[in-house]
């Protein structure tokens, strides 16, 4: 790297040291909402001792609390903000009743999606109440694609095991019978009676039923949600609630984009659970980014929900999550910094990617401010990134690179975020970034470990390639003279466990195993981290035929899928079976 650094290469906006605004929200406002569409969703924690009415009183006229729950120490919840209110929070800070908050916004799909988005009624009638589960165990699946008419989902009385199906996308695919669940006020759902009515209208033909509904997620054979259900279901008479997460959030599986929708889905399921029952949630998704600790807002909200379910509803609540498949993907890196000794991190940004890319750096509070220089591919000069500021390069009108570097200390330590624009230009997004190796050089006055992680870039639903995942390489893995990447056989990377996983009560982590020499061993791709996976299941039946065979979208169809997302439903089946072992 060239040792010459421009003094003021980046246009910066200073932050206050005690700034409590989510850096992702500051970035969204600074970019004029270029990456996002729709309202701003958020997860919040109130100051201890305050009730949710204190937040309601502070919100704008068109802002709304979606749901909330009382934890052992404080109230947590989700809410919608208008863009005007979000911008005001950036300028003035959040209301005094807010202890902390994180935003989760809809990702803008710049590509023309005509023909793939179902037609939505102008107004979806509200559903204010519905039949609750009477089963001892309620299973909850948060995924994409629910084959409610599958023959193997039928109960002895002929009805489907799906108690309720909630499509959280406003452009829902559930047909005219669907209702908008309250108090959440978005998406649409169907109960068991309505699902069976739709199937009866189609002459008990699954394919015809899904086609008439416009349920596009099930109009192909390989559907992730269907495979998960097939691995999870057992002969026991459990009710199932299926929460279909918004398509826009699945386009880019960043941790922040998922949080509010997953928590809304959990409270939706809790409202249907019978007192004294147990609820087991199958979350087969993963995220790469996040602080990966038990002190984050996400972890605290999960813990509070488990406590609330037990105290207010007499419900035993268990989350089952995937360890993730990122151990070999080079999306995590760890650097040990010595005082005044620079370290290098190379971020390889792939070409022809239609999604923005995000990098997060996390380090302990005691290390203080880090000095960061950034160098674009092909440039001979690096730029110093100012601390305590939001910086845009090369200009606010052409934001190829954005760095959010607050001085504020969070419960998880210090952090900064780097956003790079898409590298594809064949559509209407106005700004693209240079593909290649973006080099970051870090130094500081303290000693400690800096963890780097990329946000997940999803290739695209329905087989439509849209995004490509970048890679991270530390200085030990890079020849600085030629930037040739070395590829040592060092095995899986540490800190690669899913960013949704946290070491708290009520969370079980499932990892993927494979058969080798007659024994089960952990797969190389299964995520590793400080949170230990306590449930291990076979996700590779053969060295030649990868994955586990399971349900397709229709009865009689089978597909193979692998990964820790396949281990999660097997872990759920083990938890809910009488003997504690998964039946065949």
Model regions and ranges:
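Active-site-proximal beta-strand/loop segments in catalytic clefts of secreted hydrolases
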Residues: 46-47, 69, 142-145, 243-248, ...
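Conserved, well-structured beta-alpha core segment at the onset of a catalytic domain
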Residues: 72-74, 81-160, 272-279, 288-321, ...
